[in-house]
Curated annotation (Swiss-Prot):
One of its GO terms (cellular component) is cytoplasm. The RecF protein is involved in DNA metabolism; it is required for DNA replication and normal SOS inducibility. RecF binds preferentially to single-stranded, linear DNA. It also seems to bind ATP. It comes from Erwinia tasmaniensis (strain DSM 17950 / CFBP 7177 / CIP 109463 / NCPPB 4357 / Et1/99). InterPro entries: DNA-binding_RecF, DNA-binding_RecF_CS, P-loop_NTPase, RecF/RecN/SMC_N, RecF_2. Belongs to the RecF family. This is DNA replication and repair protein RecF. GO terms for biological process: DNA replication; DNA synthesis involved in DNA repair; double-strand break repair; SOS response. It is found in: Cytoplasm.
């Protein structure tokens, strides 16, 4: 699976772009503020329905315009699929697949699995549990057909329960939510635990290649104590939750803890080592997906040289090439990505929102 063509209209500082893409490496080179990251963000938005630098649609629509339009062509083993996303300033989206409207963003996400590596991506390691939950949930989404529906219902029920906690005085008044919520929580927790266990060996092997100097450990915490059924815990903790006006324990508090020599990685590793660990986690997850269902991820890497010395850049480049996946890399200068280039790759020069293929020397 690869994007063969990308059309961008009125997205960030890009007025119009029509890019024929390489199935391997695609390099975006240009000065800061030129629009390199905007291209990566357009690809990400096409597969997620939202940008990674802003959750507000109005901020990514080009000034004086009412909407952005993204269109792509995806090459599969059987045929090419046309996909499109339009979003206006009110946040209303229209998804089109093979010429038909009425599709969901989740369908795009299934068709375009992506791994994003940015300078801000350290939050996976030093941010709150929600970032590591998102990492595990990405894997569950792509491996468990029922996960997204269950996860969406869980979020809805938790929101309703939290609103009800502000109004009720007795547990019986909230029992109906809990009877629906508890089985979903148990199922989602089981999926997360199974995925965490299944991918652990892949993560460990990749981390051993990237950071052999550390003994790393990974553990999934489901968000409530192991001894309790979630339904029982909700009833037992009702008075506490009512006082807090929110549900204090549950799958929305789960975490995937990562330690080095028994210490949280953010307390021990340098920024360069943290970036390598982040890359290892993303690569391991993408490669695991390929082995599970044959799908290859797209890898989006913003500011490739940031935090990495030459040796580490070589290591990451070699591992990315070994995936045989489609990779999009931004860099300020071509020499930062020189060791990644080959005859199958394509280099684009980006300046002031204009994108042009850079001719080969």
């Amino acid at each position: 699976m690869a994007l063969t063509r990308l059309l961008i209209k009125d997205f960030r500082n890009i007025e119009n772009a029509d890019l024929a893409l390489a199935p391997g490496f695609n390099f975006l080179v240009g000065p800061n503020g030129s629009g390199k990251t905007s291209v990566l963000e357009a690809i990400y938005t096409l597969g997620h329905g939202r940008a990674f630098r802003s959750l507000q649609a109005g901020r990514v629509i080009r000034h004086d315009q009412d909407a952005f339009v993204l269109h792509g062509r995806i090459a599969t083993a059987e045929r090419e699929i046309s996909v499109g996303l339009t979003k206006n300033r009110a946040g209303d989206s229209k998804v089109r697949i093979d010429g038909s409207d009425g599709h969901k963003v989740a369908e795009l996400a299934q068709m375009l699995p992506m791994q994003l590596i940015t300078p801000e991506g350290f939050t996976l390691l030093n941010g709150g549990p929600k970032y590591r939950r998102a990492y595990i949930d990405w894997g569950c989404f792509h491996n468990e057909p029922g996960f997204f529906h269950a996860w969406s219902n869980l979020r809805r029920l938790l929101k309703q329960r939290n609103a009800a906690l502000r109004q009720v005085s007795r547990y019986q008044q909230i029992r109906a939510w809990d009877q629906e919520l508890a089985p979903l929580a148990e199922q989602i927790s089981q999926w997360r635990a199974a995925y965490s266990e299944a991918i652990a060996a892949d993560i460990s092997a990749t981390c051993a290649q990237f950071l052999p100097e550390f003994q790393l450990s990974f553990s999934f915490q489901r968000g409530w104590d192991k001894e309790s059924h979630y339904a029982e815990l909700l009833e037992r903790n009702f008075e506490r939750d009512r006082a807090l006006t929110y549900t204090a324990s549950g799958p929305h508090k789960a975490d995937f803890r990562i330690r080095a020599e028994g210490t949280p990685v953010e307390d021990l590793l340098s920024r360069g080592q943290l970036k390598l660990l982040m890359c290892a986690l993303r690569l391991a997850q993408g490669e695991f997906l390929t082995r599970q269902n044959g799908q290859r991820c797209l890898y989006l890497i913003d500011d490739f040289a940031s935090e990495l010395d030459e040796t580490r850049r070589h290591l990451l480049a070699a591992r990315l090439k070994a995936t045989q996946a489609q990779v999009f890399v931004s860099a300020i200068a071509a020499e930062h990505v020189f060791d990644m280039t080959d005859e199958k790759g394509k280099m684009f020069h980006v300046e002031q929102g204009k994108i042009a293929v850079q001719p080969e020397d």
